[in-house]
């Protein structure tokens, strides 16, 4: 079962997203701010972060950079900011996907599935410089 960390300061959005993702058989962790996000990441094995940009104790863009510097975890941004510049900034900061609010929950679930599929493919291989090993052949 994949573990998703939701970082969202709006309790209503958090509840809806958490419930819907749980119904899809994901393990869902919740963080209402950047500090809780850091704590959850340091104490749990997380497969995907769903990150809001506007947080009470910082911004999601800076937090994304911080996460990417320490962890190899895909980040899907959810934000009310929907201008092209906002999307470009988030993706250039290391975000792997961006979904503007409001959004259809089925689109969110489809994007989560796509991100996690890509993670599973990447984890199949180990790279050492130019050498790339298929871990399925090691067993």
Name every feature range the model reports, one short phrase each.
Residues 1-119:
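N-terminal/domain-start alpha-helical segments
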Residues 3, 113-139:
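Short, Lys/Arg-enriched segments at the junction into DNA-binding effector domains
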């Amino acid at each position: 079962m994949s573990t998703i960390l939701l970082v969202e300061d709006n309790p209503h959005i958090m509840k809806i997203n958490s419930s819907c993702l749980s119904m899809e058989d994901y393990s869902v962790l919740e963080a209402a701010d950047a500090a809780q996000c850091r704590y959850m990441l340091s104490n749990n094995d997380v497969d995907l972060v769903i990150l809001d940009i506007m947080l009470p104790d910082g911004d999601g863009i800076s937090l994304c950079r911080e996460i990417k510097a320490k962890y190899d975890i895909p980040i899907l941004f959810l934000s009310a900011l929907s201008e092209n510049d906002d999307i470009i900034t988030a993706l250039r900061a290391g975000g792997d996907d961006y979904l503007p609010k409001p959004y259809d929950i089925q689109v969110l679930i489809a994007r989560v599935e796509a991100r996690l599929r890509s993670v599973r493919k990447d984890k199949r291989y180990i790279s050492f410089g130019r050498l790339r090993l298929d871990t399925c052949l090691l067993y």
